[in-house]
């Protein structure tokens, strides 16, 4: 490990002999350098590929100077509302303001604005007019096309339009962000980066976009709720990276938002690399006086072993973010991570969680998915389990036993 947090000040940049950062990551969460926090993962992945990244965590959106603390980045700003949609973070289902924010120092509420992604982009644009702005994270990912907003009881446009960002990275963005960085670094204008899977862009020339499936227009969605249902169904049928089509949603004044097909899932080797990077596994020391960041407590001694879920539950948005194809880490990678944190002075012998969206999904649903992806019009588990479904928990049980056998480990959950 480097034993270094990512730069959060000019002093940090000077210590690393960085005159100008390649990227500045603006996030609605406090800076926690842990693989359960998206800003840490994306930033460390970029760092692994040779790019310098600084973090502006929870800037004061009422002060334009708060966005200039690290200077103008060479390639662009990365913006995320945080690990959770900022509105879900702020309000209960009854639309009452929550009293605490686990992703803020000391659990204090009010460190980020409502609709944080949009507000942060506007903050950047007031100071840096031409710098590329790329948005991502759960808030941007699930609002990438027209969507019903529960909080305002209205149909909102794509967050790409409302934020004024140049590009949106949806889903788990490790591969997309590296391709974006390489494109920008090669000298391509952000407006010309329209070819990367897992991204959404806007255009005034939809007729020039090839092989595109047109969704019902935004205007038609506001006129007929059945059009909204049709649009959602088309989107749902195109969440697979192997068969998903390019989608376009038209808006007034000749503007269209184009969603490229999803990125291919990471291989096990790639997953191992992502989770084996130089995370400090705790909050930045600048939060010590506040008592730290509460959100780390639930994941400090937990392990992310897999991604994706083929459950297909109606109430769950996971298909739209991580997809239905299971991606797993190797036993060696998980054991190495566990060996690191069991030496922590706060470790009491309990590994709190080993899993992901669904802990016992340690392999793809069937062999076909390796080459062809998921079935477009069939579910793995509904209305009854598919006969091709591989039901085998032996690998998961073996992993749990291996973790349990480590010194100082009492129980694994």
Label for each model-derived stretch:
Residues 25-28, 56, 60-61, 340-413:
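Conserved SAM/AdoMet-binding glycine-rich loop
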Residues 32-34, 44, 62-63, 85-87, ...:
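Flexible loop/turn segments at secondary-structure boundaries
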Residues 26-31, 290-317, 350:
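N-terminal pre-triad scaffold of radical SAM enzymes
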Residues 166, 274, 309, 334:
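Conserved, mostly hydrophobic/aromatic
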Residues 41-53:
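Short helix-loop-beta junction
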Residues 2-20, 30, 231-302:
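N-terminal [4Fe-4S]-dependent radical SAM core
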Residues 322-347, 402:
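Conserved alpha-helical substructure of the radical SAM core
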Residues 30, 38, 57-252, 259-260:
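Glycine-rich beta-alpha loop elements in corrinoid/cobalamin-binding modules
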